[in-house]
Amino acid sequence: EIGSGLVGSEMCIRDRCATITPNKQRMEEYPQLTQMWKSPNGTIRSILDGTVFRAPILIDSIHPVVKNWKKPITIARHAYGDVYKSVDMYTTEPGECTMTFRGESGEEKTLLVQKVDGPAVWQGAHNKEKSIRSFARSCFQYAIDTKQDLWFATKDTISKKYDHTFKDIFQEIYENEYQEKFKELGIEYFYTLIDDAVARVMKAKGGFIWACKNYDGDVMSDMVSSAFGSLAMMTSVLVSPAGVYEYEAAHGTVQRHYYKHLKGEETSTNSVATIFAWTGALRKRGELDKLPELCAFADKLEKATLDTIESGRMTKDLALITELTDVTVLNSQDFIKAIRKTMEK
């Protein structure tokens, strides 16, 4: 996966399949695993840095669970650090935990984390100011490119150094680099606490970008996509400061369906997010290489995919939430074949 991340940084455009993060169950299932490796996805994102932008794929026949959502809500997720780059441990006896930073100059800073009188769990997380600044600039630029308001939220009232640094950097970069352009476009940058942001999102109409720290973005992108219809109906692209675009399906490996497939059982797996990951990468490649035919192919495939669903031919997950009354539930292979037929018309 480290090699994959480095290759991606050289190729500019890449498409990533879902990956497996080993846990105890996976270690038993795949004996070839030598250790409980960290998230492959997190490893790639740490190498590439940047921001993950996720937006729902909307169709007329599937309405959001939140009735007042009329436009897409794009989640901008910081792709580096926090819990995904953390270290943790479990201790069994009374004692104390400290955190020490040792500078190259030899200067040390030590903080007491906590004293405990019994078993405890500990976690140390970090982020880099350089990465936070890249995250902020990516979000502001994406807001300008798409002409949408930008929201950002943390818990700076509790995390007065960690989260407050995120808040301060966003505000500094906005005022010094982007404020005038935002005013020209009539769009707004808005900061609030993460709990207030969640409440506001539920009452909003959509049509904005919601910038989140790494963990918040992981959780909220799933919530937003599910409320709009399905996690399989969401685009996802990692944009790095070096100009790398990594397209992916927003969901994971669809484990339950995979096990059914191994048993020879029929599945009805929604492949829309995977299709849009490929079309997104192909379109961006076409834009960079000035290949309008490639861009047109991507557009045509996306339209054929959505037209197939609107015609009533879809996978089981969409059949459960569509407003259409005349629906044909297709299995995984037949859904892809139906899209091909639509495209060939």
Question: Which residues make up each language-model segment?
Answer:
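Phosphate-binding loop/pocket of nucleotide- and phosphate-handling active sites
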Residues: 316, 320-345
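Flexible glycine-/small-residue-enriched beta->alpha junction loops
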Residues: 18-22, 30-120
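Glycine-rich phosphate/nucleotide-binding loop
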Residues: 201-300, 304-311
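Short acidic loop-to-helix transition motifs that present clustered carboxylates
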Residues: 192-199
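Glycine-rich phosphate/diphosphate-binding loop of Rossmann-like nucleotide-binding domains
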Residues: 99-192
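Flexible, glycine/charged-enriched surface loops at secondary-structure junctions
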Residues: 146-154, 178-191, 286-298, 308-320
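Single conserved hydrophobic/aromatic residue that forms the stacking wall/gate
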Residues: 1-8, 13
